[in-house]
């Protein structure tokens, strides 16, 4: 049986596949060893089937932040209560209000960016090879195995827990389920 251990290094992820404890020899690097530039995979774009659309150099922004300051947006209590009810997130603290206002300010900034003619990015890891598994044909009769993973079943179906139920707020400010 295989077990994958992932360690985060500076700007890369290295994976070590361990078959058993005996498979590790004294020459193997410990998992906690720092990742060096020699450990990183050599990724050459030329051999890729599809050339990358990710720019290799950062793009200089045309927007001067000093020239166009975004005004600080204040959110009133009625809007906060509506957002709390719709998103099921409690925004009672000052830090939550500040995070909400910062998010709105960030969205206002990126709204001004011209994206005409820019192809959508479908992954940030275009240069990484995906590990594909072999297709194994089976009889497909795995219903009992699949249903054994469910906590609660009813006849031949999974029973899902109830979803997020929005909270209604009465006139006194107390929140309760509908």
Swiss-Prot record:
<protein>
    <recommendedName>
        <fullName>Glutamyl-tRNA(Gln) amidotransferase subunit C, mitochondrial</fullName>
        <ecNumber>6.3.5.-</ecNumber>
    </recommendedName>
</protein>
<feature type="region of interest" description="Disordered">
    <location>
        <begin position="26"/>
        <end position="67"/>
    </location>
</feature>
<comment type="function">
    <text>Allows the formation of correctly charged Gln-tRNA(Gln) through the transamidation of misacylated Glu-tRNA(Gln) in the mitochondria. The reaction takes place in the presence of glutamine and ATP through an activated gamma-phospho-Glu-tRNA(Gln).</text>
</comment>
<dbReference type="InterPro" id="IPR036113">
    <property type="entry name" value="Asp/Glu-ADT_sf_sub_c"/>
</dbReference>
<dbReference type="GO" id="GO:0070681">
    <property type="term" value="P:glutaminyl-tRNAGln biosynthesis via transamidation"/>
</dbReference>
<dbReference type="GO" id="GO:0006450">
    <property type="term" value="P:regulation of translational fidelity"/>
</dbReference>
<feature type="compositionally biased region" description="Basic and acidic residues">
    <location>
        <begin position="37"/>
        <end position="46"/>
    </location>
</feature>
<keyword id="KW-0067">ATP-binding</keyword>
<dbReference type="Pfam" id="PF02686">
    <property type="entry name" value="GatC"/>
</dbReference>
<comment type="similarity">
    <text>Belongs to the GatC family.</text>
</comment>
<feature type="transit peptide" description="Mitochondrion">
    <location>
        <begin position="1"/>
        <end position="31"/>
    </location>
</feature>
<keyword id="KW-0648">Protein biosynthesis</keyword>
<keyword id="KW-0436">Ligase</keyword>
<dbReference type="GO" id="GO:0005524">
    <property type="term" value="F:ATP binding"/>
</dbReference>
<comment type="subunit">
    <text>Subunit of the heterotrimeric GatCAB amidotransferase (AdT) complex, composed of A, B and C subunits.</text>
</comment>
<dbReference type="GO" id="GO:0030956">
    <property type="term" value="C:glutamyl-tRNA(Gln) amidotransferase complex"/>
</dbReference>
<dbReference type="GO" id="GO:0050567">
    <property type="term" value="F:glutaminyl-tRNA synthase (glutamine-hydrolyzing) activity"/>
</dbReference>
<dbReference type="GO" id="GO:0005739">
    <property type="term" value="C:mitochondrion"/>
</dbReference>
<dbReference type="InterPro" id="IPR003837">
    <property type="entry name" value="GatC"/>
</dbReference>
<keyword id="KW-0496">Mitochondrion</keyword>
<keyword id="KW-0547">Nucleotide-binding</keyword>
<dbReference type="GO" id="GO:0032543">
    <property type="term" value="P:mitochondrial translation"/>
</dbReference>
<keyword id="KW-0809">Transit peptide</keyword>
């Amino acid at each position: 049986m295989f077990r994958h251990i992932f360690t985060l290094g500076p700007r890369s992820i290295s994976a070590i596949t361990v078959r058993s404890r005996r498979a590790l020899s004294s020459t193997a690097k410990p998992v906690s060893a720092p990742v060096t530039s020699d450990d990183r995979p050599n990724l050459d774009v030329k051999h890729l089937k599809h050339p990358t659309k990710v720019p290799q150099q950062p793009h200089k922004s045309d927007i001067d932040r000093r020239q166009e300051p975004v005004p600080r947006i204040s959110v009133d209590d009625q809007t906060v209560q509506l957002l709390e009810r719709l998103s099921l997130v409690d925004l009672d603290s000052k830090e939550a209000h500040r995070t909400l206002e910062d998010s709105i300010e960030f969205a206002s900034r990126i709204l001004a960016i011209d994206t005409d003619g820019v192809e959508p990015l479908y992954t940030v890891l275009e240069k990484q090879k995906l590990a594909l598994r072999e297709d194994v044909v089976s009889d497909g009769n795995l219903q009992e195995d699949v249903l054994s993973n469910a906590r609660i079943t009813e006849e031949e179906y999974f029973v899902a827990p109830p979803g997020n139920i929005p909270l209604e707020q009465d006139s006194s400010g107390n929140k309760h389920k509908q």
